Amino acid sequence: MQIVFRLTFVIEQVVPVVPVSKISVAEEILSKVGFSMSWHHNPGQNLMYAEFTHPDGISVHASESRGDGIGPVVVYFRVSNVDELAALAGATAEDQTWGTREFWLRDADGNAYRFGQYL
């Protein structure tokens, strides 16, 4: 038996939520690769939630609430020119045995931001 889904919606984007001690921790790393804070919300209790958006439309959320995830996390970005982006971030991309070229950035809370492209 084959199940056929008739979707009336489109998943536009998957947005990771990165747990951080302070929003500035995520901002420091993400700004190196072209992201900027597009909005933030402070629900009280000295907690903050923010969205960082890249000019190409990709978003990453950061949350000071440890209830949003276990953390630290790894966020993987597939990019079209990893060497150019690595140079912008002050990093060096390297070929991996699994057929990609990648570099990593790590924030002060231990979250890893990994950027790569297929070889």
For each of these PLM feature ranges, what is it?
Residues M1-E27, V33, V75, G116-L119:
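N-terminal beta-strand motif that seeds the catalytic metal site of vicinal oxygen chelate
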Residues F9-E12, G67-P72, T97:
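Short glycine-enriched loop/turn motifs at secondary-structure junctions
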Residues V14, M48-Y49, V73, G99-R101:
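Residue-level marker for the onset of beta-strands and adjacent loop->beta junctions
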Residues V18, W39-N42, A93-D95:
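Short beta-strand-to-loop elements that line the ligand-binding cleft
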Residues V20-K22, D56, R66, V79-N81, ...:
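Non-catalytic surface loops within mature trypsin-like serine protease
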Residues S21-S24, V74-A112:
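Vicinal oxygen chelate
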Residues S31-S38, A91:
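Conserved acetyl-CoA-binding loop of GNAT-fold acetyltransferases
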Residues M37-V73, Y113-Q117:
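Conserved short beta-strand elements that form part of the metal-binding/catalytic scaffold
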